[in-house]
Curated annotation (Swiss-Prot):
GO terms for molecular function: translation elongation factor activity. Coiled coil: none annotated. This is Elongation factor Ts. Gene3D superfamilies: 1.10.286.20, DNA helicase RuvA subunit, C-terminal domain (1.10.8.10), Elongation factor Ts, dimerisation domain (3.30.479.20). Belongs to the EF-Ts family. Residues 81-84 are annotated as: Involved in Mg(2+) ion dislocation from EF-Tu.
Length: 299
């Protein structure tokens, strides 16, 4: 009998097994989904694949900064549900992973997972995460991180219990006044989500593309060619004010820009990282489609 994609999708949803494994299981059980579930369990495929194959798009973003504010890390660790993200054991794992990263020389997630765990020389980081998966009962994934070292000082901010995290590298004197300014800047980044620090960080290719788009818009609107250049210039200024942190109106006082606020307080921003929980993670529907296409392309 023919095996439908609908049945494969349902079996995959129930077991977490791959497309080809689900197709084979349905073929072996004449399309009986319940029997196919048992088949996969007997083969050990369902039990092994279910947790590791599920999409982990919840979790937490965490920021960890050394006492002297010279070193810091921002990290995203994913779980499957918001419920587990609020679990004390999960929170403890995220904090410990952050502490490990503060001591790590790794520059990628793959490198980190192979490292010896900072609290147990007989285990690697991957083993610690697998133990947490077994204990908590959900797939857990160390997704990404960024490490900072500075001659200035670092400022972090966590929004909504770990839904958004920001880490900012700042040059200047650290005191009560500049600490408040730095925190306000971090909160601004969390709220407004600038794509760049300054205009200098935008590639010439991107700038030229934006200019071309605006020029085409003006031509399509019938604007005289001799004034289009000036109009495009004005639109580019607006573009910079939307995507560049230093050009943006400060969220707490829109009469000044972030750049002016920094300058007035004798500070300089060297860089920043903003993580939003789950951004860019494909959900299950898209994941299934991608896997099907992958198998089709193997033919």
């Amino acid at each position: 009998m023919g095996i439908s994609m609908k049945d494969i999708k349902e079996l995959r949803s129930r077991t977490g097994a791959g497309v080809l494994d689900c197709k084979k299981a349905l073929a072996e059980t004449n399309g009986d989904i319940d029997a196919a579930v048992e088949y996969l369990r007997e083969k050990g495929i369902a039990a092994a694949a279910k947790k590791a194959g599920r999409v982990a798009a919840e979790g937490a973003v965490n920021v960890y900064i050394s006492d002297d504010r010279k070193k810091g890390v921002i990290v995203e660790v994913n779980s499957e549900t918001d419920f587990v993200a609020k679990n004390d054991n999960f929170k403890d794992l995220v904090n410990k992973i952050s502490e490990h990263l503060m001591q790590s020389d790794a520059n990628s997630v793959d490198e980190v997972l192979k490292e010896t765990w900072y609290q147990d020389s007989e285990k690697d980081v991957n083993t610690i995460i697998k133990e947490a998966i077994a204990s908590i009962g959900e797939n857990i994934n160390l997704r990404r991180f960024e490490k900072y070292e500075t001659n200035g000082f670092l400022q972090g901010y966590i929004h909504m219990g770990g839904k958004i995290g920001v880490l900012v590298d700042i040059d200047g004197e650290f005191n009560d006044s500049t600490r408040k300014v730095a925190k306000d800047i971090a909160m601004h980044i969390a709220a407004i989500n600038p794509r760049y620090l300054s205009r200098d960080d935008i590639s010439e290719e991107v700038i030229n593309k934006e200019k071309e788009i605006y020029k085409e818009q003006m031509l399509n609107e019938g604007k005289p060619e001799h004034i289009i250049g000036q109009i495009v210039k004005g639109k580019m200024e607006k573009y910079y004010s939307e995507v560049c942190l230093l050009d943006q109106a400060f969220v707490r006082d829109e009469d000044i820009t972030v750049g002016k606020l920094i300058e007035d307080n004798g500070l300089k921003i060297n860089g920043f990282t903003r993580f939003e929980l789950g951004e860019g993670i494909e959900k299950e529907e898209e994941d299934f489609a991608a896997e099907v296409m992958k198998e089709v392309n193997k033919k």
